Amino acid sequence: MDVNPTLLFLKVPAQNAISTTFPYTGDPPYSHGTGTGYTMDTVNRTHQYSEKGKWTTNTETGAPQLNPIDGPLPEDNEPSGYAQTDCVLEAMAFLEESHPGIFENSCLETMEVVQQTRVDKLTQGRQTYDWTLNRNQPAATALANTIEVFRSNGLTANESGRLIDFLKDVMESMDKEEMEITTHFQRKRRVRDNMTKKMVTQRTIGKKKQRLNRRSYLIRALTLNTMTKDAERGKLKRRAIATPGMQIRGFVYFVETLARSICEKLEQSGLPVGGNEKKAKLANVVRKMMTNSQDTELSFTITGDNTKWNENQNPRMFLAMITYITRNQPEWFRNVLSIAPIMFSNKMARLGKGYMFESKSMKLRTQIPAEMLANIDLKYFNESTRKKIEKIRPLLIDGTASLSPGMMMGMFNMLSTVLGVSILNLGQKRYTKTTYWWDGLQSSDDFALIVNAPNHEGIQAGVDRFYRTCKLVGINMSKKKSYINRTGTFEFTSFFYRYGFVANFSMELPSFGVSGINESADMSIGVTVIKNNMINNDLGPATAQMALQLFIKDYRYTYRCHRGDTQIQTRRSFELKKLWEQTRSKAGLLVSDGGPNLYNIRNLHIPEVCLKWELMDEDYQGRLCNPLNPFVSHKEIESVNNAVVMPAHGPAKSMEYDAVATTHSWIPKRNRSILNTSQRGILEDEQMYQKCCNLFEKFFPSSSYRRPVGISSMVEAMVSRARIDARIDFESGRIKKEEFAEIMKICSTIEELRRQK
C-alpha cells in the first residue's frame, strides 16, 4: 500500500516536524594541510575592519599595531571595529543601574576563586601553544615545560601550586633580560642496515639549550598559535582558530571567571548554562515580552546574526569594561584582571606551518615555513596568495603577524556576552524614552532581539536604534543574515522556539551509535545517549526502543559479537560459540561475549555487568572482573567516566556514563611510530607526569581530598600522609608491627634522598 506522506503530519503540530528536516547525515568536512592561508585571511580582514584607526609601534617588540578605538563613526552599513569608549562605559553603567550590586558581588566571588585556584587548572584543555618548543602540545605538557623553564631561570613563586603565584612568575619573566630554554631537535643520519644491507635513515633525539633575548621571549609569550577549525558544517571555506600559550591562559581564566559570574546573574545571557536550564531561562524573557504586548502592542523577534563578531571586538574595549567593573576593588585584583586584555592588545598570530610546494616535473616537495614569507620572492605564489602575503608583510616578525585589534575565536566568550547584554539592557522604556522598547537573548556572538511597539513604524524605529547602538560598541548586526518574525517563532543557538522551545531530536543523531573506545565503554555510552534523549529531547518510548535495537545490532556488527546461537560467521564466531556452549546460564553472558541483550527502555540506567551479575556463571564472573588478567592493561576506573559526544551542531559535549571495570575495559596501545620521532621525549615527560598525578591521587582519594593549601611539595604531602595512615592502621590493628616499621623506614629513606638531591 502506498502511504501519502502528508498523512503522517495530520496529527503532528507543525513545530514537531522539525526533526524531519535534518540535513547533516554523513561526516562533517575536515581540513587538511596548512592553515597559514586562513590565518592570513583573519589577520588581513581584522585590519581591514579597523583600517581607519591609528597606527603605533610597540616599543618592546617593534610590532606595528592598529588601534581603532574611538575611531570615526560609521557612515554606511559595512562592518567596522570602531568602538567608542564612552559608549561602552555608559552601557556598563546602565547595566549596573538595572542590576544593583552585580559587579561588586561578582568581583567578590572572583577574588575568592583567584586566591584558591591551583595551577593545575591550566592542565585542562587540549592543544596548547608551547612557547618552549614553538608548537602545539597537550595542555599538561605545555604547562610542565613552562614551569620547568621558569624554575631553571630562577622563577620559583609557582612552587606554592597556586595559579596566582604562577602568574607572578609570568609577570617577572617578562622583565628578564633573557630566558634560557631547552629545545628538542632531531638528528638524521644515513647508515647501512646490517641485515638488509640497504641504507636507512636513523633518527636520534637531542636536547639543546637556547637563550632567548627579551624581545624574542615577549614575542613568544604573546603568541597565539593558529589551526584550522575542523568539522564545521554548512560552510564552503574553512577558518582559523587560535590557541594561546601558558602565559596568557591563566589571566584569561580569571577574566572569564569574573564575566561568567556576571552572566549567571543576567537573565538575557545564554551562557554559562546549557540544555534545559538555558531553555527555561530564555523562555522567561520571551514570556515577559509577550505578556506585555498582548493588548495594544505589536511584538516582533529578530533571529540575529552578527558579522565577524570577534574580528570587530577589541581587547582595549575589554580593558575599559574591566576597569569599570572592578573600579572599587583592591589594586592587586584590578591589575591581575587587566593583564589579559593588555596582552591581547599586543598579541601576535603565529602563521602556522607555512606553504607546501610541489614541482611536478622534478617530483620534489618543499615546505616554505611561515618565517620565510617575509622575504621570499612572490613569483612562486598564485594571485590570491600573493595579495595576502603582500598585505600581511608589514606586520610580520619572526613568522608571526602582529594582530592588535580583534579577539580570535573563543577567547572571551563570557565577557563579550556581557557587552552584548548591556546593549539589550538599554531597550527598557526608561532608557528609550519613546513608545518602542526591546529585550532579547545573547550568547557569545549569537542573539535574538524582541522588539515591542504600538505599530510597524515603531518596530522599524526600534530595530534601527538597536542597530546603531550596537555599532557604537563594535557589534555589527548583519542585515543580510538576520530575519524578523512575529514573536513566537525564532531560532537562538540552534534552539528553535515556537510557542516554547521545540525539541529537535535530530540534532542528536550523530551521537547515536558505537563510539569505538572499547566494548565496555561503548555499551555504556550507547544506552546512556538513548536514556538522555528520552529525558531531554522528546525521544518517545517506541522510537527509543527501536533506537536501542538498532544500537545493539550496530554494536554486534562492530565488535563481531553476534549471539552464540546465531548463524552469522565472523572471525570471532568460533570462540564465542565455544563460550556459549560451555556456559550454563547463557543470559549472564555480556552482549560483547555473544550473550543476549537484556536492555529495554526501563533499565537503561543500569550498567550491563550489574544488570546480568546475578545471572552469570561463577567462573565467568571470576574471569570478567579479574584485575590480574594479564591481557588487559587497566585504566584506573572511576565510578563515572566522561565521554565526548558529537551533536550535529555546536561543540562536542561531555557526557557522563557509568563505568564498571571489567576485562572488556581495555585501552589500545599507543601507535609505535611516535616513539621514533622528536615527540618521544615529550611522550615520556607526559607519562611521568601522569604517573606522578596517579600516585598522588592514590594517597589522597577523592573522598578525603582537600586540596593542600600549604607550601609543601607533592612528595612531602604524600610522605606525611603515608605516616598518618600507617599510624592509624597500626593502632587499629589493621597492619602488623613489622609492616608499620617498614613503612616508616621507606618514608625516612625518601626524605633522605630528597635532602641529598
UniProtKB/Swiss-Prot annotation:
List, in alphabetical order, the GO biological process terms annotated in this UniProt record: DNA-templated transcription; symbiont-mediated suppression of host gene expression; symbiont-mediated suppression of host mRNA transcription via inhibition of RNA polymerase II activity; viral RNA genome replication; viral transcription
All residue ranges annotated as the RdRp catalytic domain in the record: 286-483
Residue ranges for the region (Disordered) are: 50-82
Principal EC category: transferase
Show the InterPro entries listed in the entry.
RNA-dir_pol_NSvirus, RNA_pol_PB1_influenza
Reaction equation(s) it catalyzes: RNA(n) + a ribonucleoside 5'-triphosphate = RNA(n+1) + diphosphate
Location of the region described as Promoter-binding site in the Swiss-Prot/TrEMBL record = 249-256
> Where is motif Nuclear localization signal found?
187-195, 203-216
Q: Give the GO cellular component terms, alphabetically.
A: host cell cytoplasm; host cell nucleus
| EC number(s) on file | 2.7.7.48
Q: List locations, semicolon-separated.
A: Host nucleus; Host cytoplasm
Major localization listed first in the record, in broad terms: host cell
**What are the disulphide bonds in this sequence?**
none
- UniProt key word Nucleus: no
Bias category Polar residues: which stretches? Answer: 55-64
Keywords assigned: Eukaryotic host gene expression shutoff by virus, Eukaryotic host transcription shutoff by virus, Host cytoplasm, Host gene expression shutoff by virus, Host nucleus, Host-virus interaction, Inhibition of host RNA polymerase II by virus, Nucleotide-binding, Nucleotidyltransferase, Phosphoprotein, RNA-directed RNA polymerase, Transferase, Viral RNA replication, Viral transcription
Fetch the Pfam families from UniProt.
Answer: Flu_PB1 (PF00602)
Superkingdom as given in the UniProt entry: Viruses
Q: Name one GO molecular function term.
A: RNA binding
PTM summary from the entry reads: Phosphorylated by host PRKCA.
Q: What does the UniProt record say this protein does?
A: RNA-dependent RNA polymerase which is responsible for replication and transcription of virus RNA segments. The transcription of viral mRNAs occurs by a unique mechanism called cap-snatching. 5' methylated caps of cellular mRNAs are cleaved after 10-13 nucleotides by PA. In turn, these short capped RNAs are used as primers by PB1 for transcription of viral mRNAs. During virus replication, PB1 initiates RNA synthesis and copy vRNA into complementary RNA (cRNA) which in turn serves as a template for the production of more vRNAs.
The family annotation for this protein states: Belongs to the influenza viruses polymerase PB1 family.
Supply the HAMAP family for this chain: INFV_RDRP
Quaternary structure, from the entry: Influenza RNA polymerase is composed of three subunits: PB1, PB2 and PA. Interacts (via N-terminus) with PA (via C-terminus). Interacts (via C-terminus) with PB2 (via N-terminus); this interaction is essential for transcription initiation.
The identity of this protein, by name, is RNA-directed RNA polymerase catalytic subunit
The scientific name of the source species is Influenza A virus (strain A/Gull/Maryland/704/1977 H13N6)
